[in-house]
UniProtKB/Swiss-Prot annotation:
GO terms for molecular function: DNA binding; DNA-directed RNA polymerase activity; magnesium ion binding; zinc ion binding. Its cofactor is Mg(2+); Zn(2+). One of its GO terms (biological process) is DNA-templated transcription. Transmembrane segments: none annotated. InterPro entries: DNA-dir_RpoC_beta_prime (IPR045867), DNA-dir_RpoC_beta_prime_bact (IPR012754), RNA_pol_asu (IPR000722), RNA_pol_N (IPR006592), RNA_pol_Rpb1_1 (IPR007080), RNA_pol_Rpb1_3 (IPR007066), RNA_pol_Rpb1_3_sf (IPR042102), RNA_pol_Rpb1_4 (IPR007083). Zn(2+) 2 binds at residues 819, 893, 900, 903. The gene is rpoC. DNA-dependent RNA polymerase catalyzes the transcription of DNA into RNA using the four ribonucleoside triphosphates as substrates. This is DNA-directed RNA polymerase subunit beta'. Its EC number is 2.7.7.6.
Length: 1397
């Protein structure tokens, strides 16, 4: 294969040019000499072509003398024609005889009569010219556009260099000092100033100045200037080149002029812009020759500057120049940026030849590796192959004859086509291609008709359905392409999803229903209790109608079991089963046990079955099995006769009673509200809660009613059995529909949300079978509309998120087998409330252990470090009662470029350790982005019904076990129970092995009814609290004394007429009179030991104690009502994921303690409280100002730990990184992102999120340079700092100190080392400007850069090519990858053998 590449490389093109070999690309500023060296002549006239002869005008924008001939090998006047004069220059018209395509590469130039500043370096922020000259952009613009003079050389006068003078001041100065000083205006002045800069001297001056500056702004500016100047010095760019004396002209074929009918021309906007420049330049030359008055020349120079600005970047300054149709002209900058620009349209997204598209239909008779290709399409796509075959076999003498035969569609053509197509895979793609499974290879089968036929099982991967979807077909041409398509992209090789490692070739819908139907059992069906010798006998009995398909019978089956050491052993057993399950058993491959299918085959069970088939028996058997399952499922679904009828939606008889009860409860609350017991917010909350609960009750009654029917068994007694109701079967099997949808059909529709997301408190009590009233229908339309609108918006948002993710992760590739790090993440089961949402075995599956795993009970090693955990080992860990495992993670990987295979672990899509060269970054981005789009397209399936659960108010234990407190602080109440006074407390329940099975959050103020370490029974209540209010709990006993609580000033008191009770409510700051704005209402406790304890009351607190009352420990002083909750829906979810990955600071985020110590409150300012923490270690006191409206969770004198919450709110990821480290941050982001996806039932492996987080943590901020070359405040790559520090430490010098920086994915993509990658992502102008000024080099390490320059990517099969190139450069490459082509051969032959089954 390498030789093939060598041959490809030695090829030369028609002009005898060999393609250039290069390793990196550098971008810089061009000097005037350089521009002239590119040019083939000066463009002097604005004319384009002669409209009569259509020949280009001499010296014009399309001049043949400068740019080359218009026709191949023919000069303009026609004196020299044909190849033999190649290279001759015609003496008459001056045109060189050569190919016309040189008009695509030869440039020209324009000599500018006056220098012009390049707008990118002037206006692209920060202005580079401004930074170098240390002038403001406004001042430079005034000079450039001829509004003021600037002093370029003050001489002996009192004027200063860089000083701006108006006309008046200039003439006054002239009169006063004569020509002792010089001042100029326009770009010449700026050019002179730039020439005068002595970079060396300035750099050393700044280096001395920086350590002495105290002001933050001056320091920032100085370090920016220093960086820029050093970049200029190192890159050999000269500052004065930012002002141009010569303007390059683009080759004419890149700005074409096309004749339209009717004698008009269509032209590129660039020609207009160039014409403007040339016209003004020529006019200026003439004016200068005529020595015209200064003011006229000045105006012309300004216009020249403006026209060059428009050519380079139209609209960057002032109004954009428009063409005849009032549309702004497209300048050079617009050509390269944006979705339609050069990067994204032509370099990253090319169109391909040999492709076609058509509508898709179902191909239920196909095998998994096949697709149906219409004959018409195949004939067109494989034309070149057919021509070659016809010629080779002698059926056609020439290509022309072959072409004729194909056009006539003679019979032999079809034979040849069938021959060509055999063994030649084609690729099918469905847009949008959201992950790599959106493009797969199949073997084509020729079919009649015009629609492509697609195998039903791959629909899930393509996200395709047959309601008019279209798909594209591509033909891999070269042998290598066919080999890759076969070995890597064949649909049979992509059985597992790269996102979560579960099978993606899983039956759905009809197939599931069919399999579920035949594996159900029924009481007292025909033939119940019969005995059969084997499955053949069952088949006969079924066919003759002796036994029903659901009857409970006994059957003798022969099964092959694979035991522990991989040996197969045959067994014969008698099982209780049904004839239907025997039908299924006939297609199950040898090696799976009967018990796997001796149950109801719901979608979950089928998925498990396919998964274990893949793990135990390998790819080939699984593929055959999946196909067989599909055929069986389709057939049985048809025969079952399951369909939906109105009668199937059974409305529960208890419905009315449940609703009546709820209405009574609501009425009671309304009455309480009218009497003033509850606030409006509380009333709303409680009502919504009641209806949410009622809805659940109706739904439960309905499901109970639907799911079971009473039947008579053989003995004639009543027996409950699962219902054969069609709707219930569809939902129960997982084929279609969910409990939530059935609830709306036969229960009640429930609560609906308004367009703004708040819940309407009157629910829809009817269901779809009963029908909706006009009002109910109207309320429903909100949700339906919102669903559709959301879908449209979210698709775009989700696509954009994927694009950002791909961009940030694209250069992460597996580069080495093991980096040798000891670090990693500690994995524990993910528990929320009473459910183990993700058990430990799922979380560690496919990971490598980072240290020895020991059993908790006797500390014995269960697993050595460095083991890849597979299904078997994961099950052993669970049996050994291991509760946490430290595993390797990409977060901790120490590879310089990319990540190592050990830190990544298992390749999810292949089920074994990941191969070097696997592009894990892009895989991660696709895995996270793909469900984003799918979910957003799915928002409206529940029809906007508010999925809101009633608020929890207690912890009820599910399993028997012992209680564990996790950072819970408690005080003992007088009545004997404990009261929680911690904010982040959790309560866990551990089983007898010590493994935690449940975990609940404990709110502040909860009453805990049990002690730490005590045993509890299942169903026991451990803690209770009021979900609608937030209490203030005392931690000491004493006498209450009101402070600054004045009626009408800071508080308002309400007396209830019915009970005579008075409650005091604290007013919000905004509602207080002026006198109360700065007061802080509080309750002071005069404690029994003579001290006093302040409890400040937040706004809206309802005080529940009286002035002077005696208070015990754990009593409640007051309650703050809680706000209402919004509905959760991925609509909130997608932006949430984007926020997490963009590392945005949330509004009103939680305030964390920066140091550990004792809290006190200092002197407060107008709107803020001053929080003071006195550290334990005696370092300096930490102070922070917190706005008064924030609820502060800590009291005077309380002790806090670093990173503990001081004021509640959403977490700020930057704080977590700073105070708790990168592992805590990773866990936070992974769990938060997973929460959003889990809510939608989408499984994504944690690995993928970690990969993105690794890319977000690439940079560090230097806090102290030490003896390294870094400057304080600089942003550097983490790996670079670590390497530099190691080098410095080796010489016993001081290393640099740094803080890890968390960057959002957009920022991280733009701050990558590769300017090509960054420019093709976003903000093209800014990226290129910066890269050019600093003379950046691009090492072409990532995938994107290599695609742009048209190379194989350094991943997958392209990695070998890149490693080989690096090795040949003899730069002692870091590691060698011996390419083992025997593996590829093996894969190839295996692929060829797939025909046989």
């Amino acid at each position: 294969m390498k030789d093939l590449l060598d041959i490809m490389r030695k090829k030369t093109d028609s002009d005898g040019h060999t393609p250039i070999e290069f390793d990196r690309i550098r971008i810089g500023l061009a000097s005037p000499e350089m521009i002239k060296s590119w040019s083939h002549g000066e463009v002097k006239k604005p004319e384009t072509i002669n409209y009569r002869t259509f020949k280009p005008e001499r010296d014009g924008l399309f001049c043949a003398k400068i740019f080359g001939p218009v026709k191949d090998y023919e000069c303009l006047c026609g004196k020299y024609k044909r190849m033999k004069y190649k290279g001759v220059i015609c003496e008459k018209c001056g045109v060189e005889v050569t190919t016309a395509k040189v008009r695509r590469e030869r440039m020209g130039h324009i000599e500018l009569a006056s220098p012009v500043a390049h707008i990118w370096f002037l206006k692209s922020l920060p202005s580079r010219i401004g930074l170098l000259l240390d002038m403001t952009l406004r001042d430079i613009e005034r000079v450039l556009y001829f509004e003021s003079y600037v002093v370029t050389d003050p001489g002996m006068t009192p004027l200063e260099k860089y000083q701006l003078l108006t006309d008046e001041e200039y003439f006054n100065a002239l009169e006063e000092h004569g020509d002792e000083f010089s001042a100029k205006m326009g770009a010449e002045a700026v050019q002179d100033l730039l020439k005068d800069i002595d970079l060396e001297a300035e750099i050393s001056r700044l280096r001395e100045e920086i350590p002495q500056t105290t002001s933050e702004t001056k320091l920032k500016k100085a370090s920016k200037r220093l960086k820029l100047m050093e970049a200029f010095k190192e890159s050999n760019n000269k500052p004065e080149w930012m002002v141009m004396n010569v303007l390059p002209v683009l080759p004419p074929d890149l700005r074409p002029l096309v004749p339209l009918e009717g004698g008009r021309f269509a032209t590129s906007d660039l020609n207009d812009l160039y014409r403007r420049v040339i016209n003004r330049n020529n006019r200026l030359k003439r004016l200068l020759d005529l020595a015209a008055p200064d003011i006229i020349v000045r105006n012309e120079k300004r216009m020249l500057q403006e026209s060059v600005d428009a050519l380079l970047d139209n609209g960057r300054r002032g109004r954009a120049i428009t063409g005849s149709n009032k549309r702004p002209l497209k300048s050079l900058a617009d050509m390269i940026k944006g979705k339609q620009g050069r990067f994204r349209q032509n370099l990253l997204g090319k169109r391909v030849d040999y492709s076609g598209r058509s509508v898709i239909t179902v191909g239920p008779t196909l095998r998994l590796h096949q697709c149906g290709l219409p004959k018409k399409m195949a004939l067109e796509l494989f034309k070149p192959f057919i021509f070659a075959k016809l010629q080779a076999s002698g059926q056609a003498t020439t290509i022309k004859a072959a072409k004729k035969m194909v056009e006539r569609e003679t019979p032999e053509v079809w034979d040849v086509l069938a021959n060509v197509i055999r063994q030649h895979p084609v690729m099918l793609n469905r847009a949008p291609t959201l992950h790599r499974l959106g493009l797969q290879a199949f073997e084509p089968i020729l079919i009649e008709g015009k629609a492509i036929r697609l195998h039903p099982l791959v629909c899930a991967a393509f996200n395709a359905d047959f309601d008019g979807d279209q798909m594209a077909v591509h033909v891999p041409l070269t042998l290598e392409a066919q080999l890759e398509a076969r070995a890597l992209m064949m649909s049979t090789n992509n059985i597992l999803s790269p996102a979560n490692g579960e099978p993606i070739i899983v039956p759905s819908q009809d197939v599931v229903l069919g399999l579920y139907y035949i594996t159900r059992d029924a009481v007292n069906a025909k033939g119940e209790g019969m005995m059969f010798a084997d499955t053949h006998e069952v088949n006969r009995a079924l066919a003759t109608g002796q036994v029903a398909i659901h009857a409970r019978v006994k059957v003798r089956v022969h099964q092959t079991v694979i035991n522990e050491d991989g040996q197969r052993e045959k067994q014969t057993i008698v099982v209780d089963t049904t004839p239907g399950r025997c039908l299924l058993w006939e297609v199950v491959p040898e090696g799976l046990s009967f018990e796997m299918i001796n149950l109801e085959m719901t979608k979950k069970n089928i998925s498990k079955l396919i998964n274990s088939c893949y793990r135990k028996l390998g790819l080939k058997d699984t593929v055959i099995f999946a196909d067989q399952l599909m055929y069986l499922g389709f057939r049985q679904a048809t025969r079952s006769g399951v369909s939906v009828g109105m009668e199937d939606m059974v409305i529960p008889p208890q419905k009315q009673a449940i609703i009546d009860k709820a209405e009574t409860e609501v009425r009671e609350i309304e009455e309480q509200f009218e009497q003033g017991f509850v606030t409006a917010g509380e009333r709303y909350n409680k009502v919504v809660d009641i209806w949410a609960r009622t809805n659940d009750q109706v739904a439960k009654a309905m499901m109970d009613n639907l799911s079971f029917t009473n039947v008579k068994n053989k003995q004639g007694q009543d027996e409950k059995q699962k219902s054969f109701n069609s709707i219930y079967m569809m939902s129960d099997s997982g084929a279609r529909g969910s409990a939530a949808q059935i609830r709306q059909l036969a229960g009640m529709r429930g609560l609906m949300a308004k367009p703004d997301g708040s819940i309407i408190e009157t629910p829809i009590k009817a269901n779809f079978r009963e029908g909706l009233t006009v009002l109910q229908y109207f309320i429903s339309t909100h949700g339906a509309r919102k669903g559709l609108a959301d879908t449209a918006l979210k698709t775009a948002n989700s696509g954009y998120l994927t694009r950002r993710l791909v961009d940030v992760a694209q250069d992460l590739v597996i580069t080495e087998p093991d980096c040798g790090t000891m670090g990693g993440l500690v994995m524990t089961p993910f528990i929320q409330g009473g459910d183990v949402i993700e058990p430990l075995r799922d979380r560690v599956l496919g990971r490598v252990t980072a240290e020895d795993v020991r059993r908790a009970s006797d500390n014995e090693i269960v697993l050595p470090r460095g083991t890849l955990i597979d299904e078997k080992i994961a099950a052993q860990l669970e049996e050994a009662g291991v509760d946490e495992v430290k595993v390797r993670s990409v977060i901790a990987c120490e590879s310089t470029f990319g990540v190592c295979a050990k830190c990544y672990g298992r390749d999810l899509a292949r089920g074994h350790q990941v191969n070097p060269g696997e592009s894990v970054g892009v895989m991660a981005a696709q895995s996270i982005g793909e469900p984003g789009t799918q979910l957003t397209m799915r928002t409206f399936h529940v029809g906007g019904a508010a999925s809101r659960t009633s608020a929890a108010n207690s912890v009820q234990v599910r399993n028997k076990g012992t209680v564990r407190f996790h950072n819970v602080k408690t005080v003992q109440h007088a009545k004997g129970h404990l009261v929680s006074v911690s904010r982040s407390g959790e309560i866990g329940i551990a089983d007898e092995l010590g493994r935690e099975r449940e975990r609940y959050k404990l709110p502040y103020g909860a009453s805990i009814l049990i002690k730490d370490g005590e045993a509890v029974e299942a169903g026991g209540i451990v803690a209770t609290w009021d979900p609608h209010t937030h209490p203030l709990v005392t931690e000491v006993a004493g006498k209450a004394r009101f402070s600054q609580i004045a009626d009408g000033v800071t508080a308002t008191s309400k007396t209830d007429d019915a009970t005579g009770m008075t409650t005091v409510e604290i007013l919000p700051v905004t509602a207080r009179p002026a006198s109360g704005k700065d007061l802080r209402p509080a309750i002071v406790l005069d404690t029994t030991d003579g001290g006093e304890q302040f409890y400040f009351l937040p706004q809206n607190t309802i005080v529940t104690v009286r002035d002077g009352e005696t208070i015990g420990v754990g009593d409640v002083l007051g309650r703050v009502p809680q706000e209402t909750s919004r509905t959760r829906d991925i609509t909130g979810g997608l932006p949430r994921v984007a926020d997490l990955f963009e590392a945005r600071k949330p509004k009103e985020h939680a305030i964390l303690a920066e140091v550990s110590g004792i809290v006190s409150f200092g002197k407060e300012t107008k709107g803020k409280n001053r929080l003071v923490i006195t550290p334990d270690d005696g370092s300096e006191i930490y102070e922070e100002l917190i706005p008064k409206w924030r609820t502060i969770n800590v009291f005077e004198g309380e002790h806090v730990n670093r990173g503990e919450t001081i004021s509640d709110g959403p977490q700020n990821p930057h704080d977590i990184l700073r105070l708790k480290g990168e592992v805590a941050l990773t866990n936070y982001i992974v769990n938060e992102v997973q929460d959003v996806y889990r809510l939608q039932g989408v499984k994504i492996n944690d690995k993928h999120i970690e990969v993105i987080v690794r890319q977000m943590l690439r940079k560090v901020d230097i806090t102290d340079g030490g003896d390294t070359s870094f400057i304080k405040g600089e942003q550097v790559d983490y790996i670079r700092v670590v390497q530099e520090n190691q080098a410095v430490l080796a010489q016993n010098k001081f290393p640099a100190k740094f803080e890890r920086q968390l960057m959002g994915i957009t920022k991280a993509s733009l701050s990558t080392d590769s300017f090509i990658s960054a420019a093709s992502f976003q903000e093209t102008t800014r990226v290129l400007t910066e890269a050019a000024v600093t003379g950046k080099e691009d090492d072409l390490r990532g995938l994107k850069e290599n695609v742009v320059v048209g190379r194989l990517i350094p991943a997958g099969t392209g990695l070998a090519y890149h490693l080989e190139r690096r090795r040949q450069e003899a730069e002692a490459a870091e590691f060698e990858l011996h390419n083992d082509f025997s593996e590829v051969d093996q894969a190839f032959s295996q692929a060829l053998n797939q025909e046989q089954f």
